[in-house]
Curated annotation (Swiss-Prot):
UniProt keyword annotations, A-Z: Disulfide bond, Late protein, Membrane, Transmembrane, Transmembrane helix, Viral envelope protein, Virion
Cell location: Virion membrane
Induction remarks: Expressed in the late phase of the viral replicative cycle.
Name of the molecule in the record: Inner membrane protein p12
Topology term for the membrane: Single-pass membrane protein
Domain of life, per lineage: Viruses
PTM summary: Not glycosylated.
Assigned protein family: Belongs to the asfivirus inner membrane protein p12 family.
Length: 62
């Protein structure tokens, strides 16, 4: 991808594409690292079924 603007209007589309990709990656990371642990925390009812690391608890996978 050439970002020097030599392709005329194409560089604008490339910039928008890069921004869109970054936003999607951030949304996925937010989902996995914030939303998923919160959902698992709710399901974790019994202490023996839970595993806690760094203050975030979730159901044991095994």
């Amino acid at each position: 991808m050439a970002l020097d603007g030599s392709s005329g209007g194409g560089s604008n589309v490339e910039t928008l594409l890069i921004v869109a990709i970054v936003v999607v990656i951030m949304a996925i990371m937010l989902y996995y690292f914030w939303w998923m642990p919160r959902q698992q925390q709710k399901k974790c009812s019994k202490a023996e079924e839970c595993t806690c690391t760094n203050g975030s608890c979730s159901l044991k996978t095994s």
